[in-house]
From Swiss-Prot:
Recorded domain comment: The toxin is composed of 2 domains: a highly rigid N-terminal inhibitor cystine knot (knottin) domain and a rather flexible C-terminal linear cationic cytotoxin domain that forms amphiphilic alpha-helices. The presence of a 'disulfide through disulfide knot' structurally defines this protein as a knottin.
Propeptide span(s): 23-44
Disulfide bonds: 48-63, 55-72, 62-88, 74-86
Protein's recorded name: U4-lycotoxin-Ls1c
Family note: Belongs to the neurotoxin 19 (CSTX) family. 05 (U4-Lctx) subfamily.
UniProt-annotated stretches for the region Linear cationic cytotoxin domain: 89-108
Length: 109
């Protein structure tokens, strides 16, 4: 029984050592691949639409505020049922949350 326990401990030790060697080799290869991909990366961010500007061309292009992204709201002007007007606006709940965070920052320091 003691011999069986001794061999199982020896086997587990060798197995864990061999698996860590394989993981280390895999990590170094993955790091090299990641570095080569990052070197070839190009910036492809498109320009965002500022607050209160027309966003009808792309409703997901509104810029970010201090904490949250602005939302594209679409509506029909009073008296017109045909033309839809869209603009990037900050929701009131986000405005209130940003005010609370600003007040907390000034109080805390």
């Amino acid at each position: 029984m003691k011999v069986l326990v001794l061999f199982s401990v020896l086997f587990l030790t060798l197995f864990s050592y061999s698996s860590t060697e394989a993981i280390d080799e895999f990590d170094s290869d993955a790091e090299d691949d990641m570095l080569s991909l990052m070197a070839n990366e190009q910036v492809r961010a498109k320009a965002c639409t500022p607050r209160l500007h027309d966003c009808s061309h792309d409703r997901h292009s509104c810029c970010r505020g201090e904490l949250f992204k602005d939302v594209c709201y679409c509506f029909y002007p009073e008296g017109e049922d045909i033309t839809e007007v869209c603009s990037c606006q900050q929701p009131k709940s986000h405005k209130y949350i940003e005010k609370v965070v600003d007040k907390a920052k000034t109080v805390v320091g």
